[in-house]
Design a protein with these regions (language model features):
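Catalytic cores of DNA base-excision repair glycosylases
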Residues: 2-209
Length: 209
């Protein structure tokens, strides 16, 4: 049974309280590197991405440099990541689009970001919120699993439904903190198998809600 808005907000804010200092775990120094790192993180751990990106960014530090590289050259730096051939293809095309459509700059709106090759709603939301400080809520596998496990949404909810529900429950200034905290919570506590959430009864203490 899906929780009420007040109870769902309580659960999420207790998760934020467990990880108040949660920060992005991808390494990046600018908007282009953030965009590339998030694109690479699909079906791959952030730790694996962070091992690959120093060499990738040293070789191709700008959209211009990446656009003139071959797919094979790009792929050689990310070959240990999942779906690396497809990712190399998307990175090259995305870099060219940045040059052609956005003067080599990473755009800030969801519509413009999603016009780029290999960029879906989750990636756009991460770039907007982490890179530009624009309120957005990204739903990855951790966030979706946690929201379903704790009845914030129904078990059949789509990622978009999860996103809209959390954005309805929380004020915009808490969206990024919730996203980051849920990732840490998912890695450390709310595992796909054998979740340890019961060790944190404060999540379910609705006496003051």
């Amino acid at each position: 049974m899906v929780l009420s808005r007040k109870r769902a907000r309580h659960v999420i804010e207790e998760i934020i309280a467990l990880f108040p200092d949660a920060k992005p775990s991808l390494d990046f120094r600018n908007h282009f590197e953030l965009l590339v790192a998030v694109m690479l993180s699909a079906q791959t751990t952030d730790a694996a991405v962070n091992k690959a990106t120093p060499g990738l960014f040293a070789a191709f530090p700008t959209p211009q440099a990446m656009s003139v590289a071959t797919e094979s050259e790009i792929a050689s730096h990310i070959s240990r990541l999942g779906l690396y051939r497809n990712k190399a293809k998307f990175l090259k095309k995305c870099a060219q689009q940045l040059l052609d459509d956005f003067d080599g700059q990473v755009p800030q709106t969801r519509e413009e970001l999603e016009s780029l090759a290999g960029v879906g709603r989750k990636t756009a939301n991460v770039v907007m919120s982490v890179g530009f400080g624009i309120p957005a809520f990204a739903v990855d596998t951790h966030v979706e699993r946690i929201c379903k496990h704790h009845d914030v949404v129904k078990k059949s909810a789509t990622p978009l439904e999860v996103e809209k529900r959390v954005m309805d429950i929380l004020p915009p200034e808490e969206w990024l903190a919730a996203h980051q905290a849920m990732i840490y919570f998912g890695r450390a506590i709310c595992h796909p198998k054998n979740p340890e959430c019961d060790h944190y009864p404060q999540l379910y203490d609705f006496s003051n809600v």
